[in-house]
Amino acid sequence: MKLYRHLAWDGIRKNSRLYVPYLLTGVGAVSFFYILVALARLPEGTLPGSGSVQVILNLGSFVLWVFSLLLLFYTHSFLIRRRNREFALYNVLGMGKGDISRILCWESLLSGGLSLLGGLALGVVLSKLAELGLMRVMGLEADMTYRVSAGGLLMALGLYGAIYLLILLSALLRVRRSTAIQLMRSEAVGEKPPRANWALALLGVLLLGAAYYLAVSIREPLTALTWFFAAVLMVIAATYLLFISGSVTLCRLLQRNPRFYYRKRHFVSVSSLVYRMKRNGAGLASICILGTMVLVMLSSTTCLYFGAEDSPRTRYPRAENVTVWYTDREDLYRDHSDLHAAVVTAARSRGAQMQDLREYRSSSSALTVRNGVLQGAGGSISDAVQFTAIPLSDYNAAMGARLTLSPGQVYICHGRSDYRESTLSFPGGAAWQVKGLVDNLASGGDSASVVTQLTAIVPDEEIADMDRLMEGMNTGVSRSWSCGFDLGQEPARDEGDPVAAAIREALVSRQDDIRFNVESLSENRGDFYGSYGSLFFLGILLSVGFSLAAVLIIYYKQISEGYEDQARFDIMQKVGMTRRDIRSSINSQLLLVFFLPLLLAGLHLVFAFPFVHKLLLLFNLWNTRLLVGTTAASFLAFAVLYTLVYRATSTAYYHIVSDGGDR
């Protein structure tokens, strides 16, 4: 046993250039996972909106675990490939596959144990710092109680222990299926130079074009949400196809150019690239996808966090927002004065200074509209609207306007997508002429709705007719009285809202058969900060993780290719190639392909921008200028990191191929 343990430890030590990043990856993944689980298990009431925060953090921990599974398998494949010659020598010297398997078991036990123990220790140490950071981004006072989550420790130990067990089983299976000769040759075996596959390249272009078209053509946020994940899958598939097939085609074209190819700075780099391009293309595509994930996630969550005050203000334009629903339209129009008096009396009983009060009655129904004709259920989701009819007198009173309408005319309120038809019709021939577009007064606003709002201002004497037409659609009609007003001074975030509480008490005391909802800006602001703060925190954490994964892939890619190119450059030096020529050739190779993932990730980000903007509308965030700023800043920061990694890995590659490495 001591022999196997010694050989395993000696193998890790001698291959520290490859094992140290692998161990650090495991430590980082385990610590990040524990931190997310520990934060999700904080005592109830520690964070605002704790229900949504817990869901977000649990989802983030699941995403991190799945990503860790893929990344650790990917990086371990480099280790095994590098160790195959060593295992073959053990086999030639008399060790059987069982002995090699025992060495692998000890290596997995040592590397997995170090990663698990180091990750859990680091996670426990940093979890309090992460908790303080999360509370900071939510604008809360710090709680200095130190907690260790036993459930988080057990979950991290179990799930990541399972990953290392799967990695071990995969390595053992590979050894069992290989012969000593195969193991000896496997390190030197590169990819066969594939032929340029124009069909796959064309498929990649078509998929990417289709995804980009979806991104720029979809207008409605709900439609964008429906198609978002399909577009993501199309972009991922297209990126892999283009890098694998397109890069081969590029190298073949370069080889056909004698002026470029037969220069000593290009000859070695291009010929080695085309020899390994299938694997190289997949690695570059992975880097591009990870970079795009980082850019989209970082820009969107940062925009949400810094726009956290805009969102509740969009969702709740007034400090207090009251909605009362009636089943019967006649009851609504009879009782609205009493409702107004009840709300005003309740608010003033708490010393409220009511400002900018707006109230109106409405009838609303979920319909579809196409070419100016309203229809019931069954239409396309892109045609879905929440149609609302408001009496002209209510609109004028709420907005301080003096609009007039003749019979058969309506105004349409401005919305997310302005209504462009000249008429508004119902099945059966009933139609109204659109006199013009006016400002929206709905207390929730069009921006607060998942589907598009279509609000019509109707003559008072015709509101009953339109209500009956809506009822005939058989989709249900919601009849309500809405009231919103601001306060002279809003309550503090942690003090509750006595005005909202008084209004609820007043409405509960009524004997009417009504439903009501009282929404307070001050009461709900904490939920916004909780949700957006946790999303921002999770976005930062996962962005760091994905960025480190991209760095790790780049590092292993460069190191492994450096070892493979070592013999080629050694031959070139023997026939007269200088170190300066080697450096020039390396720069040519790296510059040729290294920045392609960054450029394509930037292109993906540009076309993803409309998609992200539409999705942020579902979070009540309309600040396009802020999103542009966070997107540009995210790309700039990632580009700087990418360039630094390029310089570091090119230096490591150069030392391996020029100095003989550490074979």
Where are these regions (language model features)?
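Short cytosolic juxtamembrane segments of multi-pass membrane proteins
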Residues: 1-6, 177-191, 563-564, 654-663
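Hydrophobic alpha-helical transmembrane segments of multi-pass inner-membrane transport and secretion
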Residues: 17-45, 52-88, 108-122, 236, ...
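Hydrophobic alpha-helical transmembrane segments
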Residues: 19-23, 58, 153-158, 198-202, ...
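Hydrophobic alpha-helical segments
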Residues: 110-254
